[in-house]
């Protein structure tokens, strides 16, 4: 009975380890080579961005 419990706990630990490794691999892949069109922004992309331009004036207000 104790032998079966040890096998059960070992199976759970190996499953959790496998899930952890897969998650870390996917996160590492995203950090190394983000997909084009992905919502992830790398540090280099943040440094190269231009400040956003303001909204154009509404035509009915006119330019002052």
Swiss-Prot record:
One of its GO terms (biological process) is autocrine signaling. Residues 55-64 have a biased composition (Basic and acidic residues). GO terms for molecular function: signaling receptor binding. It is found in: Lipid droplet; Secreted; Membrane. Induction: By hypoxia (at protein level). Residues 42-64 are annotated as: Disordered. It is a single-pass membrane protein. Coiled coil: none annotated. InterPro entries: Hipoxia_HILPDA (IPR026190). Its main location: other. Pfam families: HILPDA. One of its GO terms (cellular component) is cell surface. The chain crosses the membrane at residues 7-24. Keywords: Lipid droplet, Membrane, Secreted, Stress response, Transmembrane, Transmembrane helix. Residues 1-37 are annotated as: Required for targeting to lipid droplets. Residues 42-51 have a biased composition (Polar residues). Increases intracellular lipid accumulation. Stimulates expression of cytokines including IL6, MIF and VEGFA. Enhances cell growth and proliferation. This is Hypoxia-inducible lipid droplet-associated protein. It comes from Mus musculus. The gene is Hilpda.
């Amino acid at each position: 009975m104790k032998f079966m419990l040890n096998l059960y706990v070992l199976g759970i630990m190996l499953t959790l380890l496998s899930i952890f490794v897969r998650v870390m691999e996917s996160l590492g892949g995203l950090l190394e080579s983000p997909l084009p069109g992905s919502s992830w922004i790398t540090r280099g992309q943040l440094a190269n961005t231009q400040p956003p331009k303001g909204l154009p004036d509404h035509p009915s207000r006119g330019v002052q």
